[in-house]
């Protein structure tokens, strides 16, 4: 029984390591694609990064790079998004720095990039127009329209540029 458990832990660790390596490789491409999508929404100076972290654990069952790590059914990586909204700003966790309007536009960028693999069918954007107007609003409106071809998009907006491209009101 002990040998079987050791074998299962070894197999899990091997698969989790492969998964972590794949995530690390894909996260670079994903970061680039999301940055490009953000630039299309007039967030020209923004930097976006997908970071992988592992939480340490007292449990010695699974080790990664010589450290005991917390593990689960999806491996041992924690994924966190980092953002610098403007050139020269330090990159920080998205959850701690973005304003409401920025979060909506970043989410629009993420959802636009991941739309084919995303199981979520309905997206709600609340005041995605906060802090923008003119050309930026036109770009956001077009991105929402493009996304609405794949998903149901519900958008709360005050700008006519965005409202005018909706199929239904």
Which residue ranges define each predicted feature?
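Conserved NTPase motor "head" modules and their coupling/switch loops across ABC/AAA+ ATPases, GTPases
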Residues: 1-124, 146
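C-terminal lobe/lid and adjacent interdomain/linker elements of RecA-like ASCE P-loop ATPase modules
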Residues: 79, 135-169
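Conserved D-loop-proximal element of ABC-family nucleotide-binding domains
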Residues: 92, 117-118, 130-138
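Catalytic acidic motif of RecA-like/P-loop NTPases
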Residues: 104, 129-130
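Generic enzyme active-site microenvironment
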Residues: 124-127, 156
